Structures are given as C-alpha cells and as structure tokens.
Amino acid sequence: MARIELLPRVYGSYKANLHCHTTYSDGNLSPEQVKEHYKANGYSVVAFTDHNVLIDHSALNDKDFLALVGLEVDTDSFLYGKKHEFNQTCHLCAILRDPARAVPVYRAEQYTGKAISAKIDEFHQNGYIVNYNHPTWSCEGADEFLHYGRFDGMELFNYSAEVANNNGYSHGEYALALRLMNHRIRCIAADDNHNGYDCEDDSCGGWVVFKAPELSYETIIKAYDDMCFYSSTGPEIKQCYIEDGVFVLDCSPV
C-alpha cells in the first residue's frame, strides 16, 4: 500500500499565530512590536485580527515574515437582546484570502444562529476564511454553534483564555462540531494575545505550523485550505503519514 504523507516533508514549516490583538484595538503592543516579538520566537506568520477593524499590515512583510490581513468580530448576547445568567458571545476571526480584495464586513447585530450564520456566509462571499473562536470562554455550546453554519475552523485551544481564566480548551465543543455539523472543520490553536502585562503574558502558547513550498500569502492560504498544517501547544510534528493501514506520528517529546 502506498505511503500517504499527511504533512509533506519536502515543504518548509512556517509557525503561525492566527489570532492577535494590537494597539489598534485592545492589545498593548504595536503591530511592529508584535512582529519583533513573534519573529524572535520563531514565528513566520501572524494574522492581525484586531476587534471589528480591518487593517492591512503588509508593510511589515519581509522574506521571513508574513502579516495576514484579518479582524475579529464579536456579537454579545448582552448587547443584542438575549439575556443569560452569563453573557454569551460569539467571536469570529475572519482572514482575507487576498489582501488586495479587502471588502469590509461588520459583526452580526443579533445574537441568533440565523444572524451569525448569515454573517459567516457574508464573510465567505467576500473572500474571507472564518474561524470560530474560544467557545468555552464564550459560554457557548452546541445549542449555539450548531446553528452557525459552515465556519472553516474552530479554536480547540486559546492561550489567552487559558492563562486568564483556565478555560482555553474546547475539546468537547470541537468533537461535537465534527460529529454533528457535517463538514470538515480545521482544528486551530492560537494565542489571542493582548500582552497586558508583558510580552510573554499571553503570547507563544498555541500555534499552527503550516507546511508550504514557500512563505507567501497565496501558499499559506492554500495550506490552510488543504489542511496542510498542524496545531500545537508544544510538540513539534516531524512526520505524519499512513502506511500499510497504519497511522504513524513522529514528534518531539510531549
């Protein structure tokens, strides 16, 4: 039986943070400081996803660093007419597939499955990838996200939520989504960094490693689409393949 490479070894590895905040919203580092900090820690890619504002930081790009253009939109139950004991909220990271095609899309203004699903559709129609963020932190469960339509990825791990509130893991929610939503959902680990105390406060704790032939906007988006990446909070995956019906994973110590 032919060997099936799940992470092509001939490709380069590009470490990425797909959820990041700067001084353009509620973060404490400038985009330039974010780039400096993440490059120093071995990252090649950062998606700049400030709250409800789309800003192109491609001026930060160099041969070893790529800024993805995106934003995080949030719809709170408290603000939009649905009262709960806890303030439920839906946060979505939307990342442009083509930074030259930047069409602003704003958050849903009703906290309903129908409104949020329509907003995800609008993002897709305007050339965005959509990741559903930190459901555990958001106090959301299957009753909510099963009505959100076809988001592309879900944060299985959010480092900022884990550091601040011990609720950054969303294993159960991800398992339910895979079983019940009838489409492939990418598994994302991300920082959601705000750097409120120092650079290390909520940075470099959860990441994605893309496998791509080179570092460019197009190749990283293609790697996302093709699921040619893995998410981690520590171990490095060196090989991942299926051979003779056996799944083989070679990684650094866990």
Task: Show which residues each predicted segment covers.
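C-terminal functional module detector
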Residues: 1-9, 13, 182-186, 193-254
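A metal-dependent hydrolase metal-coordination microenvironment
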Residues: 2-129, 133, 140-142, 147-149, ...
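Short, well-ordered alpha-helical segments in soluble proteins
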Residues: 155-161, 179-182, 228
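Sec-exported extracytoplasmic/periplasmic mature domains
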Residues: 39-44, 180-183, 225
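Functionally critical loop-and-helix segments that line ligand-binding/catalytic clefts
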Residues: 172-179, 216
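Active-site-proximal helix/loop capping residues that flank conserved catalytic or ligand/cofactor
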Residues: 128, 152, 222-225
